[in-house]
Every structure is written in structure tokens, then in C-alpha cells.
Amino acid sequence: MQLHSRGSSLAMPPPPIPPRDYQGQQTAVQKDQKVSNSLFVPVSCDPPAVPCGSVHPVPLPKFYKQDKPVQTNNFYGNLLVGEQTLPVWTHPYSVWYSKDPDYVGLGISHTASSQKVFGDDPNANPVKYFFSPVGICSLLLTSQQLQHGHELLVGECERFSCGVRFDCSGKSMSVKLVQGMGFVTAVYDGLSPMIKSKVGIQNFQQKQGSELKKYVATLFDQTNWVIYSSGDLQLADAYTVVGTTPGLVQIAKLCGDEQPYDAAAGAYVDDMTLSGSADSVERYCFDYKLNGRSASGKTIQWALPHQYAVFDQSTASEAVNMTLDSTCKGPMKAYLTKQFVMNEELPPAEVQFEPWSQLHGFTGYSQDRLDCIRQIANEEVDSFDVVNASNTDSMYTAGKILDKGAFMLYVVAFVLKDAQLARKQLDKMKRAFHRFISNQQQAPLVYETNWKGVVSTGGLNDGNFYVDFGNCFYNDHHFHYGYHIHAAALVALADQSYGDGSFLKFSRAWVDTLIRDVANPSKEDSYFPVFRCFDFFNGHSFANGLFAHGDGKDEESSSEDYHCYYGIKLWGLITGNGQLEKLASLILGIEKRAINMYMLYRSDNTVVPPNFKANKVSGILFENKIDHATYFGLNKEYIHGIHMLPITPMSSYFRDPQFVEEEWNEQLSSVVGSLDDGWKGILMLNRALFDPKSSYEFFAAPNFQYKWLDNGMSRLWATAFSAGIGG
């Protein structure tokens, strides 16, 4: 049955042309928001706008102190689920809970770039994947008492840190894991320190230079490790160092000058907090809270390439002459500091709703382009039944379909300025959204009170993690909810000009709830963990939720990652929430730099191995591995296309013309002609980012076939977008 808009709305006179200053036209503001210049203020502290439930198939681990919502997609996730024995990457180190006989404790490893393993064919260029070996137990923090029984507890789980405690009859060994930490630090309470090595200790020597006892262990693999201790240590055998006094033990790998470690020894990071001001959005800080005392009053922290590329002079001046390789993200540099201060470049202010590219910005439309777009609109708006098409059991699929309809709405409302078509499409979009906002979809959402988040009920009761791509296990929430958030922003924009303006009020709490689930900026919002998906240290989001994985967290779509924060940016504009809009802009700025180092590879990329970068895109980026693949197949169009979709005004900010042209010429031009499904449309719209004319001609052609469209893609948006950037 074809759905039509209500007849009464068609008789209304056309509205005035909406101004381009979208932010200026918004009047809805948060009346209850506390006055603060911080970027990191709550979106809301209200109860979630979905029902509550107490069932979840993944049990919580044993905690020693955890009074906040628990992170689900974080770097220490392997310590929360399963056997809790898989590695955690703080970078540059990996650590893990070892249960091996005679080696019970916290294993420590660092792998150099020379140890990387390449495959399938290591001599190929490009290779399909590379990874760093795991489980090389260079050193292990333990105690003799732990070998005879203990309990592992995790606690104080924050966004950038997590505590691990080995309890033994009221005594303990505690380690705080912090991203980028310079030392692996253990505090022994009532237990005698013991350090073991599976590699073996060739030489163990006490040295001067620190207020603490200082030792250097040379292992049989010729790596050198420095150990600081508050008490005396002795080499018992080639695999064991023992101490007799409870207290502090710190371990780090030597990589040049020892003096910076000496200056930092005795102090360690207990937690890291974010700070940033809405008055200077591009500037953000990692503030490190230190425990203990060092000669310098500072500690060693390691930085990744996307960080030290934008360090403020105050941080850059604290660099020391030490470098260690990361697993997948190039060389890390060390800093003797208590704070990282970064000055990031932000997206251009004009990147909002209308088509935009780095080539020409927004070019506007000639009459013949408008005529073509109008013809397509008349066909597609009538034929696309968004109300029923979005009625699925998948938040991901439904989100893509809603966003397809929202892009179509934008075109008829703000490109064609066709009041009749706009109201017809707006009516359908509001009805489609009503199903989700009123939680009447096939698999309703629930706020589950164990891990504390909004999940699909699909798979929740039976633990089927294949349902909706693992949504109930916190997989891909920024992908799934990002589509809904973005679509809602476009509908709210159109409703202000062509409707009664009620959609914003009706949808506000629900959309805010989705935003809070994926990107809650503040601990003051006690319903959700802070920044579930986006990792400020790694510079991008992680999609993997409550699953143990031997290579750590991962992400296979850079584009659906930034699409989420693009949607949040637009929602901030629509709602008048300037701090939210600025926060999203900062995240987008960070992601642009990181993604173009670690996921999208121009020919001048110097971060990934030279024998991998000709792939042009990462495929799946893990914490310990990059695999040029997807979870749903190995076709070239899959691997590249999942890093493209959806193509939006934000796409060209990330995918610059040089990269897109290189990728097209080297990887895609030989493939696209043989495609006969939705991936063809994805690749051809991506072509608009360097060749908008060819892209426009493809979508505008009379013999265009709709089977060439992905289910989240419309011919109408593809034509309007490519035409609007010079096609």
C-alpha cells in the first residue's frame, strides 16, 4: 500500500526559503543545562527514555570497587569477560592475567616492529594482514604467595584506566592500568614482591640514579628492562627475582636514555581525566593524577603519532629521548609530564547539512541539475515506503533506512524547496520515527541495569550474539545509533520549516538517550559510562563490545564511526546545544587525523608498514593487528566500501580528494564495472569526492538501475550530493 501525506497539509502555502545559518535559526535551547565552559558537560541526567530491565547474558566480573557504569568497549575489556586471561593493550605495553603454573600474576610484554608477523604471503606487497606476537612473557609481576591461591578482582574502571587486584588472604598486589603508561607499577600490600620471566634473565644488575632501588635486567632475547623497587631485590635463578619487603615495584623497557625513567621513578598514574573548554574547542588535555613521588614530580607517559603531531609547545617541550613501537600505530614517543595538551584542527564551519567537498565546497545547482533531481524526487519519494521498510528487528538496518529517508527529505525540502514533496516525505519520516521513539519496533530497546546501557532486546534473553550484529552485547552502538541520531537531526530541521515543529520535542529525550549511550561526556550522568565508543587515546572508536578477543578491541568501518559524531554535531546545532556541537567537532577533528594515519592510507602515509599501505584502507583495525578484510566477506568492494558508507557532507573532510583518487585508481576502478548490486552505488558516490561529474552522470543516467543502491542509499541524495559539489 502506498502511503500518502495528510491532505490538509498540502493546502498550506509554501514556506520561505530557510536561511543557510542553521544554527542562527534554532531557538530550542537546554534551559536546565548548568552554566559551564567545559566541553564535557552532561547531555542530560534524566532517566533514559526507554524501559529498564535487569537481564543480560554476560555476567559482570568480580569487582573490588566499582560505583560507576562499567565500560563495555574499552581497552581493558578482556579483563572483564570470559576467562579474563587475554591481553590488554595500554600501548606500548600489553599485560595479561596469567594462570600458567609457576607463572601466576600479571604478564608484561612489548613487541618491537621487527617482530611483526606478515601474511598470508609475507613476501606480497601489499600483505593481507600483520600482527604482533602475543604472550611473550618478558616479565611477570607476582608474589610467592599468589602461586598458592588468589582471587582476581577488577575495579575503579574509568574511561582511561582500570585497576587490577590480586587478593590473597587479606593481602594484595594491585596494578593500575592506564593508556600510555610509562611504567607497569605494582603496589604490594602484605605480600613479598616477585618478578618472573619466561624469556629468562641473562644478567641482573643493581644501578644508581634513583631514590628507589634500581635494577636492570637483560633478558636472553637481549632486551633490557629497568626495575625500580622500594625494597631490595635479588636474582634467585635465571627466571626469578625476589624481594622481601612489601611496597612499590615499577617496570619499563629500556630504549635509550635511562635518565628520564630515573626522574619519573616512584610516581605512577592513578587516573587520567579529560579537560577542554567550549571557548577554545580545538584545545583539549589529558590530565594525569599521580600517586607516589618522583624526583621530577612527574611521570613518563607515551604518546601516539596523532597526538604528538598536535602537541602544544608546553607538552612538546617535555619530550625525552625514548621511542617504543606500538603494535599498529607507528612509533610512540615518551614525555616526562603530568599533562598532555593538544591543539587539534576542527572541521570547517560550513560542513553542516548541505553537500560539501574539499574540492569545491558547495557549488549550488544549475537549473538542468535541479530538473533532473526533481524528476528523481517525484519517482523516489512516492515509491520509497520508509514506514514499512524501517519496520525491521535490527536497529542497524532500521537506522540506515531511516537515514536514507531523511536524506531524501533534506533534498526535497532544502535543495528543491518543494513544499508538497517535503511535507509528504516529512509525514512519512515522522510516522516511521514514531515507532521507534514509542519503542514499538520488532525488537524494542531496553536500558539494562547490569552494564548500564541501551540495548536491543533481540538476543538479550537467549544470549544470541548474532542478532542485530551483537547490539545487545554493545557491539557497534555508535554505528547503529549514529544513523538514528543523524536522521532525527534532518527530520527536526525539516519539521521546523515545513511541519509544526513538534518533532524536536517529541524526539528529544529519545535521541539524547542514544547519544548518552554512545558518547556520554560526563560522570555526572550516572546512567551511562563516559564515552562508551570513542577512545580519546587511540583517536577513534572501537566497535567490539562484551567479547573477549585475542587481538583486543576492533573497528571495521571508519565512516560509520565518524557518521555518528557528525550526527551528534548536527543534533547539537538543531537543539541549540552549543557544547555538544563543539564536542562533536573536536571528536571529528581528532578522528580525521587518527583515521588518516591508521585506517586510510595515502601514498605519503609513514605510520603503517610500507608493505601494507598499498591496500589503501585498513580493513579491520584491531589493537594488535590490522586485517585487510571484513566480518562479512573478503570482496574488495566490501573492504573498501564499509569505510565509505554513508557518503555525506562530512565524508570529504575525512576522505580527501588525493586519497580517494589514489584508492580509485589503484584498487577500485578495475572492480566497479563488474559490480551489479548496492556496492556499485556506494563506490560510485564515493567517486564524487574527487570526480563529481562522473559520479553525477552515473546516478542521473536514464538507464540507472535501483539494484545498484545499498539499502541505506537513495538515488535522490546521490544525485543531489554529486551535483552540489560540482557534478
Question: Model regions: which residues?
Answer:
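Ser/Thr/Asn(+Pro)-rich, low-complexity disordered segments
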Residues: L3-H478, P521-G539, N544-G545, T575, ...
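Aromatic-rich carbohydrate-recognition surfaces in CAZymes
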Residues: T392-V415, N471-G499, F503, S507-V511, ...
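Alpha-helical scaffolds that organize eukaryotic protein assemblies
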Residues: L490-F536, G567-L570
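Active-site neighborhood of glycoside hydrolase catalytic domains
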Residues: V511-T513, S558-E591
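Substrate-binding surface in catalytic domains of secreted glycosidases
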Residues: D554
